[in-house]
Amino acid sequence: MNSELSQDLGASAARQEHLRDVVEHAGHLLPAQGPIGVFVHHNTLHAFQHLPFHDALAAASAIFEAEPYLSEADYRAHIASGRIGDEDLEAALAGRFAAQPDERRGPLSRREIERLALRHPIEAETAAGLLWRISEAGETRRLRADVPDERRRRMVQSTERWLEARPEIAARLLDRAGRDPEARAALALWDACRAVPLPPAPPLEPPLVERVGEGRSHRDLLVELAGEDPAELIDPLMIRFLGAYLDEGIAHWTMPDRAKGLWRCFRDMALEGSRLAAPAFVGLDAELRRFDAEALSPPAIAVRALEELSVAEDHWDVYVTRVLLELPGWAGMIHRLEHTPSDRPPGSPPVSLVEYLAARLTLARYALRDVARRRLGYRGPLAGLVEHARRAARPPAPPSSSPDHARPFRLFQLAQLAGLSAAEIEPLSKAERVWALEALEAFDEITRRRVLHEAYEHHHRTEVLHGIAANLRRPEEERSVEAPRFQVAFCIDDRCEGLRRHFEELSPRHETFGVAGFFGVPIRYRGLDDAGHVSLCPVGVEPAHEIVERPHEEEAGWRRKARRKRWARFLHALGRGTRTLARGVLLTPTLGLLSTVPLVGRTLFPRAAARLRRALERRLLPPVPTRLHSPRDEGSAAGGEGQPFTAAAKAARVAATLENMGLTRGFAPIVVVLGHGATSVNNPHQSAYDCGACGGRHGGPNARLFAAMANDSEVRVLLAARGIDIPDGTFFLGGMNNTTTDEIVLYDQHLVPSSHRGELSALIGALDAARQQHAHERCRRFASAPREGDAARALAHVEARAADLSEARPELGHVTNAVCVVGRRSLTRGLFLDRRAFLVSYDPIQDQGGAILERVLLAVGPVGAGINLEYYFSCVDNRRYGAGTKLPHNLASLLGVMEGSLSDLRTGLPKQMIEIHEPVRLLVVVEASTDTAAALYARQPALRELIGNGWIQLACVDPATRRIACFTGDGFAPFSPPDQPLPAVQRSADWYAGRSGFVPPALIRAASTRPREVVDHAV
């Protein structure tokens, strides 16, 4: 007896352990987005990254029921607009037939069939739809409108000649079509297509009832059979519970006893203060007490539920995944918080995906029984539900005695598009007809969209590489800066491409660089007014140093801090007061009335209201001069966290960043290091607009710290020993670029030597002119922006967008990102790239062994791919992979957004962030020989996964020969640019003027560094 009990306990423990493994595996398929306050872009299909790109899309589409590409209609619209050309389609088909030879039977080859299917819809039709198209629309009496005129004439002429030898057929057609030769040609072709009976197309998949437990759940079965979704009984309860349990600060009253864990809180909710009173859940309280009496753990409860549902253990993985994907946003957040506790504030309750699964399956059993009883009249055990549904399912209809015209009708459409008349179709055997249809059917919708997508990307890739090739044909002296007056290091962010271009157009002596926006300085930072520290570094990096912003005068700082605390306590008390019964009755009407004045101002005059608010803040909280301080600086006493920031550590950080971007000599008198971030109001996705290299936060503190370290005399001595000799006359300045308003702030200007003050004024003037021109360029993409007007008016518009409460698009973020160029600026200086390119500075001449390139690609590759792929997937299916429109979004638990007051957490990007995006994979152009790139590819698994599996596309520009080669999977193939010149204009504004859509590359003469008559911008 004891032996049998031990065996049962052992088997139960093994099943529970298996369930934990299943849940952990399923968790990888859930959205990995963390709390929305620190939004970091990532590959939406991270769990499939080990697969080739197109295979991953197919697998994910099957699991998530999501779209892998744009629709065929979208791609055909791009064909019509010229965004996909004939050469692009042929290149995509050539890639498809590279591994399999073409085949021809009868008048058509497989490649010709596929070419026609790409350009024209040849859809299968239902019986009812086909009947309508034939009898009502009369589509067999005329040729398709999209048949080219030349083929139309040839078909009519061929049919007339064919009918001359067949007077009986001609007579019948005369009765049916009259004397219209096109109608006769169409009817004759239709008769020829249906003259030979064809077998029906095979079914695509077995009935759903046969797939329950094997990719589909009992919920799916009841939705199909009963027309009611059991999840509608469960989801409102789970959403309210999870919102309260996971809340990080929205709720006025916190859920009690959260420290006991998710399952115990769920159990308490059901048993105590919030009984589940719905009729569907009668008996739940008694069952929960039985669980307590048996001391069942959440894994044991989940296992028991699966057994009651009769789900075989070897099918648990697909079934559990299906259940968790019923609320993927909430389930994904639980999984994320369980494995990344650093995302949460101190004191947060424990979370467990297994406990969530146990709670959901417990409710699911009751909901399934309720729907089955009410809708199907089934009152038996859930284990018998599938068999009951199988018996109750409608038997298949007997074969119809009437002929099946579905496949002949597709043959009829195919023949028209190919220009084949009845004369060519009539002689075809049944086998030849079936072969043509099978070739068409095998080239199904998803395959067609894949090929169209590859053609779409081919067009984009050709445009970009053609632009770079044309730019490289210009003399080197036109593309490089010999004696720079100003040097500005921007983040690699694609939004900086336009600002860099406009700054360079102002003078041939303006030089820019691109480097990851934390500037190689990962820190834990606390600003003067911040409540705590934040990590300003890429996700996955643990900062070793702590930096604090302190006032120069401690007394002034304490006065400001005290005044700020008093004001914050007052506002907090008012906010809490409006939520209480007694004070709320008094405060709400009064405050509501008073708030109408600023509300009207912020709505109708957002820019003016924002300026007034900032002026009041400066009056109430006067700014104080500050400095950056490390509590663990060398020689300091204990205090703070992290390691001491020694001179050697500073020099190592500065040297690595300067070497990465190739700035080791030729320093300008003023070098600006410019971080970036964004500002907006009423925008839960604010963090998604900030610097990804800083973990979804502003990069200004990193830039300021880097400049301070580079100005340190002791650091410069150590840098000189490493071969980086920064002249005494060079001064570094940190700064911050607001990508929403285009504002640029330079820090610590009071430290600039008096000898540089004039140049500093000129630099500020140049940056101001560049940001105005950049705002002008950005405005062409905003539907509400002024179409006419100067740069100053455009700047005022973008400033107003950042302060507008009603603005759903304060800026467009990384929308349009498509390219990453890793190399010297001479590759792209003077090339218009439409703000679509991540620009990463790298000098191959200073990196003969490829070590720097390896470092750069390992950092930039995953980051760029993550941004690009999140935009890709949110664009191709904003319902499944994206967050939908912002308009109904509400902040939920300070974790994410949901639609209205009761929905799943919406992950991914909202519609307003991707509306104008072109979903293409990131094209990474590296200035390196193919040998160097191949060596890095072979050595680094992370690069091999991204490049080899096609998640990003790679092209190399040889530093010696300037030839371009593209990675194909089997090696590198030379790129041959189109035999046509690239357009050239004087300035960027001349090229984008009057255009609101995408603009292809062009050469910009104003950015040329060749000596010419030019006046340096100054104020």
UniProtKB/Swiss-Prot annotation:
Chain positions covered by the region annotation Disordered: 624-643
Protein name according to UniProt: Probable inorganic carbon transporter subunit DabA 1
Keyword Metal-binding: yes
Cofactor entry: Zn(2+)
Protein's cellular compartments: Cell inner membrane
GO cellular component terms, semicolon-separated: plasma membrane
UniProt-listed InterPro entries: DabA (IPR018752)
Annotated positions binding Zn(2+): C491, D493, H676, C691
